Regions:
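Short alpha-helical elements
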Residues: 1-189
């Protein structure tokens, strides 16, 4: 499914008048609450006050999945930057040079891990005078992608025994999400 997501992402980018490989990515993570089946590998996310698994994802600027990595929820976001950056460059043919991230990816180690793979991290911060909900530039794209994935029942919680199964289901969900857009793009051409 990973190869299908890669091919569909390239086709959708070309249909949108963009280059086949993105030059920027957006990184974020979301915590999925564990179930008794997945409980053995679950960790506790203190920020979300939830026990489960954390899905670290990278999407392009259109919201299409580049790569993802599943860890226990107790893992810090900044510790996953190196692995995500390597997978991003593999998926994008070494063309991504900039990644938009939230406050969870701050720190010298995270920036150095990304730079080892040729990616500069740009932290998108909340405005000083924040009142209520604020739409952050660039960051809303990855949140929308998580919203798309959460519509699939198997991805609303972590029901899986193995992390690679959970990752595979995310790739499958994005294939299902991209296919209708491909048919729309092909009917225009």
């Amino acid at each position: 499914f990973e190869a299908m997501v890669h091919d569909l992402r390239m086709l959708l980018r070309l249909a949108d008048g963009r280059t086949p490989h993105p030059s920027a990515a957006i990184l974020d993570s979301r915590t999925l609450q564990s179930t008794p089946t997945s409980g053995g590998r679950a960790g506790y996310d203190g920020a979300k006050r939830r026990k489960g698994s954390k899905v670290h994802a990278a999407v392009d600027t259109l919201g299409h999945l580049l790569t993802l990595h599943v860890t226990p929820a107790s893992e810090q976001d900044r510790d996953q930057v190196g692995q995500l950056a390597e997978a991003i460059q593999e998926a994008s043919n070494q063309e991504v040079t900039l990644a938009y991230v939230d406050q969870g990816y701050t720190g010298q180690r995270a920036a150095e891990a990304a730079l080892e793979h040729g990616i500069t991290l740009e932290v998108v911060k909340l405005p000083e005078a924040k009142r209520g909900f604020v739409l952050l530039p660039r960051r809303w794209v990855v949140e929308r992608s998580f919203g798309w994935a959460a519509r699939f029942r198997r991805l609303a919680r972590d029901y899986e025994r193995l992390p690679k199964t959970l990752a595979g289901l995310h790739y499958l969900a994005f294939v299902c999400l991209m296919l209708p857009h491909i048919s729309d793009a092909m009917s225009i051409v």
